[in-house]
Amino acid sequence: MAPFGRLYSFMPNGRVFKILAAATLNGLEIEITPYQHMVDNKTPEFRAKFPAGKVPAFEGADGLLLPESDAIAQYLAQSGPYSEQLLGRDAATSAKIRQWISFFDGEVYPHMLDLVIWRVGIAPFDQSTETKALARLEFALDVLEKHLDGRKWLVGDELTLADLTGASSLLWAFMHIIDASERKRFPSVVAWYLRTIETEEVKEVFGPPNLIDVKRVHE
């Protein structure tokens, strides 16, 4: 069977895991195209398909061209037998799922990225950015901790795209920032995160848990 579509992105990309997880649940084969960031996305051929030059970007076997990770994840979530589970079985549930996706996009991922990029050598360290980003990430984790207390999943009683988006947004945070001492502060978040990435149907996408013991600090 031919792939459902192809994905353009550098790997690993924290915005891609939710896409591949949704595709895997729905039994959709996605081809990961060989890609060199800041080279391939600047070519005339790429810009003709995706004028903004952003990745991830999706090209469907039917010719659909779709940038923006949340849009791609939603499209793949809606394109198979798990669509109602992933996106909600009624309007209220769908809205709640969208609420949490927006939360991770605005309140988690940008601050996580600020904390990670200097630790992996992509950007120089800046103390002001570090302080603000850590405070914002811990605030978001506190919101999540309170919501997840007594809950198995973010919305309702089954895995949804909100959970896949959340786990994707926090994957690098657990690898580089949320160390053992932090994890003690947010036990419900940790339990939910592990439950999500260890779900049988998607665990190959996320890989085994990679939890940092002590986060790197600038000297």
UniProtKB/Swiss-Prot annotation:
Species this protein is from: Fusarium sp
Any Pfam family hit: GST_C
Name the record gives this protein: Glutathione S-transferase-like protein LUC7
Record domain GST C-terminal: where: 90-219
PROSITE patterns, alphabetized: GST_CTER, GST_NTER
Function: Glutathione S-transferase-like protein; part of the gene cluster that mediates the biosynthesis of the mycotoxin lucilactaene and the lucilactaene-related compound NG-391 that act as cell cycle inhibitors with potent growth inhibitory activity against malarial parasites, moderate growth inhibitory activity against cancer cells, and no activity against bacteria and fungi. Within the cluster, LUC7 and LUC8 encode proteins which are not commonly involved in the biosynthesis of secondary metabolites and are not essential for lucilactaene biosynthesis.
E.C. code: 2.5.1.-
GO molecular function: transferase activity
GO biological process, alphabetically ordered: translational elongation
Disulphide bonds in the chain: none
Keywords per UniProt: Transferase
Keyword Zinc applies: no
Any one of the GO CC terms: nucleus
Enzyme superclass (EC): transferase
Family, per entry: Belongs to the GST superfamily.
Domain GST N-terminal: 3-84
InterPro entries per the UniProt record, alphabetical: EF-GSTs (IPR050802), Glutathione-S-Trfase_C-like (IPR010987), Glutathione-S-Trfase_C_sf (IPR036282), Glutathione_S-Trfase (IPR040079), Glutathione_S-Trfase_N (IPR004045), GST_C (IPR004046), Thioredoxin-like_sf (IPR036249)
